[in-house]
Amino acid sequence: MTDVQQVLARADQNLSTSLERLFELLRIQSISTDPAYKAECRKAAEWLVGYLGTLGFTASVRDTPGHPMVVAHHAGASADAPHVLFYGHYDVQPVDPIELWENDPFEPSIKDVGEGRKILTGRGTSDDKGQLMTFVEACRAYKEINGALPCRVTILFEGEEESGSPSLKPFLEANAAELKADYALVCDTGMWDRDTPAIAAALRGLVGEEVIVTAADRDLHSGLFGGAAANPIHILVEALAGLHDETGRITLDGFYDGVEETPDNIKASWETLGKTAESFLGEVGLSIPSGEKGRSVLELTWARPTAEINGIWGGYTGEGFKTVIAAKASAKVSFRLVGTQDPAAIREAFRSYISAKIPADCSVEFHPHGGSPAIHLSYDSPVLTKAKNALSDEWPKPAIVIGMGGSIPIVGDFQKMLGMESLLVGFGLSDDRIHSPNEKYELVSYHKGIRSWVRILQALAA
């Protein structure tokens, strides 16, 4: 067997013990958005440092004002080998609503779901602990067979991706010389379908905002004050309802500055993928497309901007009933950006729009929650071509190059601050329920994900 075949065989042999290691990491409740889990986030970072040390990496926990980073270096490859920076995140989303989980979210398991499929269940299986471990386990297989890796490898794992990555930019600035590589590898994306791997070449940007409207200085009796006193819930929902017009377009002033129409040849290539609104929405129990009228579901999710209300609350929400007019109402709103839309300009447009809707005797405050521009990568870069061929050798169907509706701010940071383009490869599926109860990761995604990184590292080094 060739070296790569021997490494692939070792990855297969290691699968059972690899799952045991993954489950150890999954049991750590590294929820970055909740301060109550600060110690768990550090525990996850320390676990990763300990494990990477067994693979020959020089690894360390790096403190930040928030949750720590993990940085590791493996210099076993030759000096002229390509240098790659692999990025992932060990933090996870909260598990609410806990009552909707079929199992303990932090007690992972393997489930047989029929038709030859098995899934890994638990928070972080797909986003992103399972994904990052595919790369780490590929490194393990190489070390056990060759004693070295085919590329020089630096690893960066962060613990605040799910909470807006507030410490990431300062950390990159302070450690740019140490972290700079030939290119970055990012494993926080997904497959096109169960048999078709994908490389994402475009990502939407993101702006997050929390808005709080305050009316009276306390909750009011709705019988005594109803009809006379301002109701902040009414004010807020009316303002938010006006974010879209009847055609689905967003009404903020200047919102579409920097948004270009998708070229016809690109739209034609997307049409060949066979993804209809019905098939796309049917996976989540819906059937009628929303958003801008007259556009395909792939254009809407890959190439058009959005405004979404992610949460809204105010007044009494407990058991039973309480007739009050709330003193405050709050919402969290996110915008996905495309083209050259400016996150700062979008944030200002939203704040101006909401502020203009607030009565004179009420007040409004805003809290930012991250902001990053859209990213476009070259469709014909040599790195992308090598990875595409390597993935095609592993999976039943050839790899494809796609857009991506989500945001990975680190990709823009790598490009802007370290001068590196990123290869975006992941093995999640659209039904993995990331950020939702009953998150899962296909066993074949994990297994073939490891094998895929074995092939990609070999291809990059060739």
Please give the residue ranges for each predicted region.
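Short small-residue beta-strand/loop micro-motif enriched in glycine and branched aliphatics
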Residues: R117-T121, D217-G223, G318-E319, I434-S436
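A common structural junction motif
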Residues: Y90-D91, L243-T247, R351-D361
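Fold-level recognition of mixed alpha/beta catalytic cores in primary-metabolism enzymes, strongest
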Residues: G124-P289, L298-P305, F414, N438-V444
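N-terminal helical capping/dimerization or prosegment-like subdomains
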Residues: T2-I98, K328, A345
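Oligomerization/assembly interface segments of phage tail-like spikes and tubes
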Residues: E209-I212, A327-F335
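A generic structural motif
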Residues: S126, D217, R336-D342, S372
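An extended, acidic, His-containing surface patch that forms the Zn2+-binding/catalytic region
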Residues: A79, D193, T251-K328, T340-A349, ...
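Active-site metal-coordination/substrate-binding segment of hydrolases
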Residues: A81-F157, K448
